[in-house]
């Protein structure tokens, strides 16, 4: 599959980091206590955005990623997250989730260290 080189991967990574922070704050959700989970999910969203032009949920298997992107159901934030605040990836956790931290931000250094 041909890569869309509209924006470089580092720019998409930063865009997904900012999106994740903003969305967590807006929805009153929190990142996982294990920052590597948060980092890997943000990286996956950025890679899908880089490859396909959309932040398709990286925690699921798809037979046809382009079809899934067109359907929009699993584009982040996915329908289960928007409707029920259920994030399969554990990126956005409700405060009562045993794996939720008290963080709604992840700095660039932590993100980069966790995915290198």
Swiss-Prot record:
Catalyzed reactions per annotation: [thioredoxin]-disulfide + 2 reduced [2Fe-2S]-[ferredoxin] + 2 H(+) = [thioredoxin]-dithiol + 2 oxidized [2Fe-2S]-[ferredoxin]
The keyword Iron-sulfur appears for this protein: yes
Cofactors (names): [4Fe-4S] cluster
InterPro entries hit by this protein: FTR_bsu, FTR_bsu_Cyanobacter, FTR_bsu_sf
GO cellular component, one term: chloroplast
Annotated site location: Increases the nucleophilicity of the active site Cys: 88
Co-factor note (free text): Binds 1 [4Fe-4S] cluster.
Main location per the UniProt record: plastid
Disulfide pairings: 59-89
UniProt subcellular location: Plastid, Chloroplast
Chain residues that bind [4Fe-4S] cluster: 57, 76, 78, 87
Function: Catalytic subunit of the ferredoxin-thioredoxin reductase (FTR), which catalyzes the two-electron reduction of thioredoxins by the electrons provided by reduced ferredoxin.
Subunit structure: Heterodimer of subunit A (variable subunit) and subunit B (catalytic subunit). Heterodimeric FTR forms a complex with ferredoxin and thioredoxin.
Protein name per UniProt: Ferredoxin-thioredoxin reductase, catalytic chain
Organism this protein belongs to: Pyropia yezoensis
The gene coding this protein: ftrB
């Amino acid at each position: 599959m041909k890569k869309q080189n509209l924006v470089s991967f580092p720019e998409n990574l930063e865009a997904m980091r900012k999106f994740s922070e903003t969305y967590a704050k807006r929805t009153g959700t929190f990142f996982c206590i294990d920052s590597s989970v948060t980092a890997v999910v943000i990286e996956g969203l950025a890679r899908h955005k880089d490859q396909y032009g959309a932040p398709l949920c990286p925690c699921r298997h798809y037979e046809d990623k382009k079809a899934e992107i067109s359907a929009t159901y699993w584009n982040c934030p996915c329908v289960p997250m928007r409707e029920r605040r259920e994030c399969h990836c554990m990126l956005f956790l409700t405060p009562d989730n045993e794996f939720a931290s008290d963080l709604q931000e992840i700095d660039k250094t932590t993100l980069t260290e966790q995915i290198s």
